[in-house]
Amino acid sequence: CPGGTASNVLTYLAKGNVALSVSITICTTLLSPIVTPAIFYLIAHNSIEINFWAIVLDILKMVVAPVFIGVLINALLNTVAKKIFVFMPFISSVTIMAIVAIVCALSAEKIGSSSILLFVIVCMHNILGIVVTYIISRLCKFNKQDSRTLAIEVGTQNSGLGIILSLQHLTAFAAVVGAIFSVVQNI
């Protein structure tokens, strides 16, 4: 899944390179309608049926369309947009919490039997991604600010999108990983 706006905020708070963070977020968001379904297909097509074009359309509806609508509203109705945008962080947070709660409710039985293992795996995945990215970027002679930014970008993804795609194209239990990741990436 592409990076989310949270990575831009975390980069700012960590005194990283915000311009680099925003650029990466824009690129991953624009590439996500093709890259995300391609990754789904490459990883899972032998195990389950993957409808590539359905995933493309879902990402366009959930990620790309809202971005363009937001830009359009901001351009055409700037005064109204400023009033609306004040509430968007709260609405986004409540929406993600509701999605996580629904996913957990749908998979409560399976979560109970594997929650610790799943939590450890998701934590290790996230920590390793952040640490390895930082180390490799430093070895490639990136400065500390850019290395910090890249590490944050790798460790912060649009987990809401991952949850929804898992619910629609996999199983409710698969969405649990996204729900756990949503919590872990914000710790």
For every predicted segment, state its role:
Residues 1-187:
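Alpha-helical transmembrane segments of multi-pass small-molecule/ion transporters
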